[in-house]
Amino acid sequence: MNNSVKKIVFSFQGKLSRSEYFLYTLFVWLSYYVLYSCIWYIISDNMTIILSPFLLWALFAISTKRLHDLWRSGKFLFLVLIPVLGFVYLFIILFFKKSSIINNRYIEWNKVEWDYLKNPSACKIEWLDGDERIVNEVTGLHPVLVSKVETPTSIQDVLHVLKNTAWPISVWGGRFSMWGQTASYNSTHLDMRGMNQVVDFNKKEKTIKVQSWMRWCDIQKYIDVHNLSISIMQTYANFTVWGSLSVNVHWRYIWLGPLILSVRSIDIILSDVTLKHASRTKNKEIFFGAIGWYNALWVIAQAELELEKNVAVKRVNKKMPTSEYKDYFIKYIRSKKKSIFHNWDMYPPHYKSINAVTWEKTNEKPTTKTRLMYWWKDYSLEKIFFWIFSELPFWKWFREYMVDPLLFAGKKVHMRNYEAWYDVADLEPNSRKKSTYVLLEYFVPIDRFEEFTNVMAEIYKRHNVNIINVSMRHAHPDTESYMSWAREEVFAFVVYYKQATSEVEKNKVAVWTRELEDAVIAVNGAYYLPYQAHATSEQFHKAYPWAKKLFKLKSKLDPDFRFRNIIWDTYYKTDTLVEAISTSKETSEFKEVFLDTYWSDRFYLFLQNIYHIYPEDSFHYLISQSTKKCNSDE
């Protein structure tokens, strides 16, 4: 949090839009009020004077950055010395004047410093002289040791690596998945970020063919000049096409669904070092198996995607009780052909109200001066608010009743590409050392919406989960992908929460995550695989009943199990492990319980609801660690 505060309070570089300036000003005055009250109450009212220089400095800094947005120098603030008229003039331009053009001498430094957030490269291990590297994902919770990292830049390079290595193969995308979906222990790890070029573009047919490690933001920049937009992409433009294909992503597109619905064809490198072209009509078994199957069989080298016209969209939002949402969606959103994007945010900690946001096609003029969002934007304020919402009491209430009404006040009209130009940096904390932010996602048939919502809320409350936000999207059925998470029309619950990085907390999260996965399976839904793989093998197959088709296909096309990652290390070919556990002759009853995930979780619930003498999370973890060290209960 410190770096973010410094950027707001002490930095005079950068720019602030009107809405950002308003929020920054509100934050400064609220902070001043809290500190003033504490000093006045604890020490004396005379000591409150020490806050004045800090208040003036902060207001001067953020006002300077607002003037930069208007292409003016911070020296304009000296107009306040002119009685009445100077203050009135500054107030009007700071709070009401629209932004000036993006490129001006006050903000050019940002272009040099910022790009879309990227995860760092694999880390060398200092005490080893070999090629081993540590590969981690965005949460920092699940590092994986790989034997070697290769960096191909072409299909020929990939073929060369596959021919000349006997190690298992894992493939690196953007590494924004939150377990080990891009890595496997002791594998040859392919860092494919060099394969990021446009292969073919057809403006008339509205299609584009790209190398699979091109990011969505790079495609947007390429096609925006032709007034075209990506048909279906992932929420954040940082992610690669390969990563999105591997997880069969979706977004807020109301008339669409999973990414596979907008894919024309793919070019795939198989484990036998052959290149195949696959589509709905050619090698369709490979096509339907590749998309959404997390690099289990092949390397998706290139993809041909469908495009749409880039149109203006207008924001419309409505707050309502959660119980009224399904009827509202069916009556006002699903039946409206002009709706382009739609999602809602459910407010923790009570989950009784939501804010539904729709972006509708419009002929109105955009309220932003640029066709694409500022890719170098500073997210200091967002980081501070995320920390406040997650750490301080009553601030979730403050967000619902104070912050969001301000954020959603006024008219907003964007171009479709602008609204799809999100940077995952706005979710990234300054540090993930002691705590981290994590995503989960659940797909619920729309007719079971209220049933699942009530169970979800109860689980989060009982386990005291630090939920930041629950956002929902809509998706139409996908009957093509073997790993389809939308076998019927669904609502997608995207859960953003905060957890500590301690082993006790990891164990606690695993327990309530599996409980929630049971809840979504009970309503004939599914959980999303890009996140922490806590589910049991039984839960996996219940959520993805077509997975056995893919296992059969993998045994045919990758009999040596060359293509791997933590997902398939966990769920593929687990029969041997299950047999080993079932035939174990351990005499410890505690060990028998903790060797079985189902009974281990039931024991956690017993500690939580019946034997509630000690904190169940710490006590459960202590017992589980003790059983690993002992072979009996004595």
What residue spans do the PLM features occupy?
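Membrane-interface extramembranous regions at the lipid-water interface
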Residues: 1-31, 59-76, 92-116
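Membrane-helix interface segments in multi-pass membrane proteins
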Residues: 31-59, 80, 95-99
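N-terminal regions that are enriched for targeting/export leaders
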Residues: 117-137
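Glycine-rich N-terminal segment of FAD-binding domains in flavoprotein oxidoreductases
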Residues: 140-232, 248-253, 472
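Structural signature of FAD isoalloxazine-binding scaffolds in flavoprotein oxidoreductases
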Residues: 179-199, 254-273, 299-305, 493
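C-terminal substrate-binding/cap subdomain adjacent to the FAD-binding core in PCMH-type
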Residues: 246, 264-458, 462, 466, ...
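Substrate-recognition/cap regions that form aromatic- and gly/pro-loop-enriched pockets
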Residues: 413-535, 539-542
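Activity-critical C-terminal alpha-helical subdomain
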Residues: 426, 521-624, 628-633
